[in-house]
């Protein structure tokens, strides 16, 4: 018997007994919880990602889903912007070792609609991660930009370059093969040619790279070519481009290298840093080259033209074909010419310090773009050096600390 002075709700043996008089109140709570749960399930079912699926994991008629590796970087972010403007679906994969999350945020703000853009933070050197990305997303094409890309640094850390460029490209190809992705636009470089005896450079110019960066890219190209020989369904474009300058004409994106990488960066970045007073002056490495004024001669291609070439290559890619194209203006300019244009663009009389040559550099490199002009109907439009630098300078001046400032 239960003692008369014990309440029915007291515990016995670790169990709890509830007063029957409280039952209606608890039943009401249960009913309310069931209604709320049902409502949540209904709302969840309406969401694109219900059941582990999303628009990014399904092929959709009329929509081309492009994986942009290195899409948080300078060139990759500009390419992503162009693809999104042209109504492609874009997935950016980047480990942010060289890229900038600020660029991704700009793109996310410009294209917030569901199913337009997603960002995946990942290292393409991890095979399991790469396979997981391909397994969970329905890609129609890959634009492979991701790479460490400084000539000087490559001479100091060659193994890093072979791992990052050559090995990672191999992992991308294996994942493409496993998951049926049949279109590749590969970002290569004029550095694969080395220092040819004859100018301008055509696509059949012998490739004799002289630094680890160029060698790693050449090896990646060779792997791609060998891979496609046994796969007649593959559509591949290899774009060997020259020295990239400029930024988005509307001022949304720019070049923002990490502070620790500035010493290895492009000459345009160094010019702007000097104009902003971030560094005391510009260091020109090499004045004894066999050129008219003793400085290196390069073919400077505006990033807007460059990404246009990538989109045209994507549109023209055909199964069982490999297209190899130089992407340049066809005109070489010396470093001294470049510096003069930068001074005019910034309005700053930049201090110049002349130093000895940088290891792995070559005297003269410029392209013959006839093939890409003819086959892809592409021609560089932004060929005024001062104007390209002026556009880039406007972004740099308003973002002196990169995407962390405005």
UniProtKB/Swiss-Prot annotation:
GO term, biological process aspect, one: UDP-L-arabinose biosynthetic process
Entry binding sites for NAD(+): 65-96
Cofactor(s) of this protein: NAD(+)
Membrane topology: Single-pass type II membrane protein
Reactions performed catalytically: UDP-beta-L-arabinopyranose = UDP-alpha-D-xylose
Cytoplasmic side: 1-26
Recorded GO MF terms: UDP-arabinose 4-epimerase activity; UDP-glucose 4-epimerase activity
Spans through the membrane: 27-44
Highest taxon above the source species: Eukaryota
Signal peptide start-end: none
Protein name: Probable UDP-arabinose 4-epimerase 3
Organism: Oryza sativa subsp. japonica
């Amino acid at each position: 018997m239960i003692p008369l002075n014990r309440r029915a709700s007291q515990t016995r043996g670790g169990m709890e007994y509830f007063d029957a008089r409280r039952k209606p109140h608890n039943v009401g709570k249960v009913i309310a919880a069931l209604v709320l749960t049902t409502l949540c399930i209904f709302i969840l079912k309406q969401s694109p990602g219900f059941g582990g699926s999303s628009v990014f994991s399904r092929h959709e008629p009329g929509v081309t889903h492009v994986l942009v590796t290195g899409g948080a970087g300078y060139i990759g972010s500009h390419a992503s912007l162009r693809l999104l403007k042209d109504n492609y679906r874009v997935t950016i994969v980047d480990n942010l070792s060289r890229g900038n999350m600020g660029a991704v945020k700009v793109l996310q703000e410009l294209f917030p609609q569901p199913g337009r853009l997603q960002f995946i933070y990942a290292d393409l050197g991890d095979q399991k991660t790469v396979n997981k990305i391909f397994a969970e997303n329905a890609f129609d094409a890959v634009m492979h930009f991701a790479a460490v890309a400084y000539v000087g640094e490559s001479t100091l850390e060659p193994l890093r370059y072979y791992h990052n460029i050559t090995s990672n490209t191999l992992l991308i190809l294996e994942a493409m093969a496993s998951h049926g992705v049949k279109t590749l636009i590969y970002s290569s470089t004029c550095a694969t040619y080395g220092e040819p005896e004859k100018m301008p450079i055509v696509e059949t110019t012998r490739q004799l790279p002289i630094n680890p960066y160029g060698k790693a890219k050449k090896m990646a190209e060779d792997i791609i070519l060998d891979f496609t020989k046994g796969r007649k369904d593959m559509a591949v474009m290899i774009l060997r481009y020259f020295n990239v300058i400029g930024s988005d004409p509307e001022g949304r994106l720019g070049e923002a290298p990490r502070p620790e990488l500035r010493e290895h960066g492009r000459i345009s970045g160094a010019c702007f840093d000097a104009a902003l007073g971030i560094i005391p002056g510009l260091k020109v490495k090499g004045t004894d080259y066999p050129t008219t004024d003793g400085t290196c001669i390069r073919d400077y291609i505006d990033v807007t033209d460059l990404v246009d070439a990538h989109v045209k290559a994507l549109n023209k890619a055909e199964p069982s074909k490999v297209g190899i194209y130089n992407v340049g203006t066809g005109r070489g300019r010396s470093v001294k010419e470049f510096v003069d244009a930068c001074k005019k663009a910034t309005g700053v009389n930049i201090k110049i310090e002349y130093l000895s040559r940088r290891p792995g550099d070559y005297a003269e490199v410029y392209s013959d773009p006839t093939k890409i002009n003819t086959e892809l109907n592409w021609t560089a439009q932004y060929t005024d050096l001062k104007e390209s630098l002026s556009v880039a300078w406007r972004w740099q001046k308003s973002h002196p600390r990169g995407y962390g400032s405005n």
